[in-house]
Amino acid sequence: MLQPAHVGHLPILRSLIRDGASRGSFDRELATDSREAALFFSNLRQALNTGYFVEEDPRTGDLTTVAVPGYVYLPDVGGGANKPIGFGLFKAIDLGFELWLTGVDAEWRGHGHGRAMLAALLATPPGKRAYIVRVHRFGSDSPAMAHLLTSFGYMLVHETRHHAVHLRTDAPPELGRRLREWIPKETTG
């Protein structure tokens, strides 16, 4: 079952994101107490309060606000039904949404919760228009996520140094044509 994410969910989101970062599924910096991680989680708090995240536009360098609807996942069965065990955050793009961040608590993996949560996320209004998913290429859970995305109609269309970019097969043709300009440039190092 999904519930809209709110600022009260920040502790569980922070925990799941830090765990995912330590496994290589998200930027590893997010697993640290760095200035960048503090800024990210401050922006995430704002997004959970307002629905918007502040970030730098990769094309112009300007700061911009981006719609970031999100959900937490509670299992329909089991002892953890009273607390979220997973989450999904979408980020608005020019033509729809990117499934931006998603994860399931490690203790609950391997029991179908990732598939159930992804199905529920993709049935939400932003999920129905979530045409892009970027997956860290070398995370310990990346192969499982890539397999899961394939089963939901996504295909690998581009790889950067750090990410595999998956595009849903029913994405607007214009999005596929503009994909390279939309993908943020990755710095070396």
What is each model feature region?
Residues 95, 141-142, 162-165:
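Short acidic/glycine-enriched loop/turn segments that link adjacent beta-strands
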Residues 109, 132-146:
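Conserved beta-strand-loop-alpha-helix junction that forms the acyl-donor binding cleft
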Residues 7-8, 15-100, 105, 118, ...:
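Acetyl-CoA-dependent GNAT
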Residues 129, 150-153:
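Glycine-centered loop/turn motif at secondary-structure junctions
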Residues 104, 110-123, 147, 151:
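Conserved acetyl-CoA-binding loop-helix of GNAT-fold acetyltransferases
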Residues 152-189:
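C-terminal "cap" of GNAT-fold acetyltransferases
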Residues 1-2:
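Extreme N-terminal starter segment of soluble prokaryotic enzymes
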